[in-house]
């Protein structure tokens, strides 16, 4: 990416995005933070996101938007929870107090309110507040990115797409980072099943900036959803040098690469990717995206009958630290996979019991309100599946299969639960469940033709129960 000119106070004002500080250095550091967030890359020449935010705070500790960015990024990362993290909770209070002690623009006030609302667990309302900002300030990249990520956590696929579509015309080709906004739009198109259009838009973004790892990620998804494995593998290999430097997303792109290999049944190659890239990057970063990718990959391999050795025991050392965070049900389910895989019964019990406790009085916490009817049954289904109680696993997952979208994540990520349901139904002693598995396999085969994984599952069904058709 060509070096971008960092905006000073006047440049922000000229863009209609006035910042309440008199420090040009702070304005430039804030811009540097946004650039790194948008490009999924901690840039050492800019000091990394953490370095930029630290310098902002040292230079102008009263700069509210610095606190908004710092707290918002922590919350959106979902790796720290104000429920159990006093330092984060104190930082949020500092932000709120500062916002009340000085004159701010209406846009800045809305940013503070949105971060406070997200911290309180009311994700839909937080998204609405970021949308209010975008209605008046369509080039506010922080509001756009926060809204995009929030919709992703809510499973609101159309909103994720349309939120970007509403502002995209304001991002002219000469506007810095406009191609990255186009890449965001490509992902929304993908998640709403406009695969060909998503591919076209992602390629347009990559034609401007080939290191745009989010657009690479969109294309990886398209090949995954179409089971076009050879094209996916070729694309990964040909572009690896372009995206592997995006430290905040590279692990996830390698995870997509590994999904192709698992789909093909090339488990050794998948484990090699895990050991060489996916696990090391997770242990280095500790980021939630990397953590859930590690859990998901090991679980998928285990469902395929692969012995993953001590890898679960290594991973649970990270996941058990987040047992009582309860930021997202999606995260909790992946922590549970890790504790089950490592046979850590105490951590499993703590996770489930603390979830159940929070479900009793969720208040405005949107994720906690989903525990009783969605999170708890899914957790119990994984526990039953792990114990070989396939009948119970099916009875828990099948009634809510069309609600699983609400836990957030992508279609590719949530496909794990489709696979659990099918595997459990195949292995069930119930004739009813076996018949369910048969029709689910037919559904899957039509929706994703030429999938080797589906063909393996069909052969497994036929080996146990006779011809499928």
Curated annotation (Swiss-Prot):
Entry-linked Gene3D superfamilies: Tetratricopeptide repeat domain (1.25.40.10)
Repeat found in the keyword field: yes
This protein's record includes keyword Repeat: yes
Gene that produces this protein: ttc38
Listed InterPro entries: TPR-like_helical_dom_sf, TTC38
Descriptive protein name: Tetratricopeptide repeat protein 38
TPR repeat windows: 107-140, 179-212, 251-284
Entry keyword set: Repeat, TPR repeat
Entry's family note: Belongs to the TTC38 family.
Domain of life: Eukaryota
